[in-house]
């Protein structure tokens, strides 16, 4: 049990050190940096993936993009991309980190958005057209509300991936919670490694809970009940 006692000892040392709660390297600032990187990457991914997924799902054209995107999600070496973009763009800005994170985030959102729209009951689509709605109106008023649970699920999966993977931002000299892990290993400060790792896990759990709450608020009870029946 020595490893367990060491774990809690390092954890207590990390969170009990006053210097870790203030200044540019303090926990609040590192959390804010991590949030900024993650939120920017996720927002860009949503702006790219949701419209494309809606368009492909509604028209049925360009489905090969979804297939390629799904396979890409499994094959992307995030750290390799990070190194490549650092070499191409340098470390003077946050974009060498943001671009790989966006590329990592797009596939789950794109695939789930597409699947959500294509999975809507054809009778609902026909009924919407029968009521006189046009293509864009059918999409926004009839299809999107039904597909919303899957779309939000894609966003949640991407958000958790981004929060966890933003740790690699520390490799470029940028901030975020990954600084504790990377710097801790470099200096054999295992209290920082353990504390930073716990913070990253907790951050990911909070993000997951927030998205679950958002889904409960945004999705109509009728759609939720229908999915439970399925």
What do these predicted ranges mean?
Residues 52-85, 101, 111-115:
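Cytoplasmic-entry segments and transmembrane alpha-helices of multi-pass inner-membrane transporters
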Residues 29-37, 86-108, 147-149, 192, ...:
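Loop-to-helix entry region at the N-terminal start of transmembrane alpha-helices
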Residues 39, 135-168, 195, 200, ...:
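Transmembrane alpha-helices
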Residues 60, 115-118, 122, 195-230:
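C-terminal transmembrane helix and the adjacent membrane-cytosol boundary/short C-terminal tail
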Residues 87-88, 165-194, 198-200, 219, ...:
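Glycine-rich helix-loop "coupling/hinge" segments at transmembrane-helix boundaries
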Residues 1-42:
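Periplasmic/extracellular loop-to-transmembrane helix junction in inner-membrane transport proteins
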Residues 112, 116-151, 177, 181:
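Short cytoplasmic-facing helical segments at TM-TM junctions of multi-pass membrane proteins
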Residues 47-52, 96-125, 148, 155-167, ...:
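Membrane-embedded alpha-helices of multi-pass transport/permease systems
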